[in-house]
C-alpha cells in the first residue's frame, strides 16, 4: 500500500523522466519499505500524459534517475538496515 495521502515521499525529475519514491507499510507487521515507479511525460495534442515505456535515448536518463532514487533511499535507511523503518 502506498503512503496514506497517495503522494510519493520524494521525486526525482530529469528532463521528461520522473522517479517517484513511495513509502509503504504492512498493516499486519508494521514493516516499512520503499518502492520506486518510473515514468516519462509526453504531450499528446494539448494534454500532458505519462507512460512507463521508454525510448532508446531515454534509457541513460532512466538509469541515472534510478541510481539517484537508490542513493536517496539509502540515505533514509538506518545504519545496518536495507530498508526504512519508521
Where are these predicted regions, by residue range?
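Single-stranded nucleic acid-binding surfaces, predominantly the OB-fold ssDNA-binding core
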Residues: 1-86
Amino acid at each position: 500500500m502506498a503512503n496514506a495521502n497517495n503522494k510519493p515521499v520524494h521525486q526525482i525529475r530529469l528532463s521528461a523522466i520522473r522517479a517517484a519514491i513511495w513509502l509503504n507499510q504492512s498493516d499486519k507487521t508494521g514493516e516499512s519499505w520503499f518502492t520506486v515507479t518510473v515514468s516519462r511525460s509526453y504531450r499528446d495534442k494539448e494534454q500532458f500524459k505519462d507512460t512507463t515505456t521508454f525510448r532508446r535515448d531515454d534509457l541513460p536518463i532512466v538509469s541515472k534517475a534510478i541510481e539517484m532514487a537508490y542513493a536517496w533511499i539509502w540515505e533514509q535507511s538506518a545504519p545496518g538496515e536495507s530498508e526504512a523503518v519508521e
